[in-house]
């Protein structure tokens, strides 16, 4: 598998390209036999559903907006979150789970996969941890904090 970063596509060498071209819209087979697939979250979900372990597009097509440079484990956590709709992050304390989740959410919003994100948190961490992280860790996102019982 080859990631074509310029065109935001994946090049695959498959025994049965018809299975992929029928399932993933915008995919095609080249004259040399490579199957070209759009490198999108939706396409990755479909490919993984048939056993092709395609990488998350966030790893190749995201600018990581933040005053912080992400560590590799934070990139991998954000990638995991973008391709696993039901996920639980159990990384150690202080490893950047909050920022990884925000990068994943920011990416999914920027590519139109989701429109809003709901964060439920104890009041003690809502403003100072999540609010600050959203303001500092994304270029154009603003939190709206609601409290109540």
Task: Annotate each PLM feature.
Residues 15, 19-30, 52-79, 83-86, ...:
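SF2 helicase/translocase NTPase motor core
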Residues 4-54:
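Interdomain "pre-motor" coupling segment immediately N-terminal to P-loop NTPase/helicase cores
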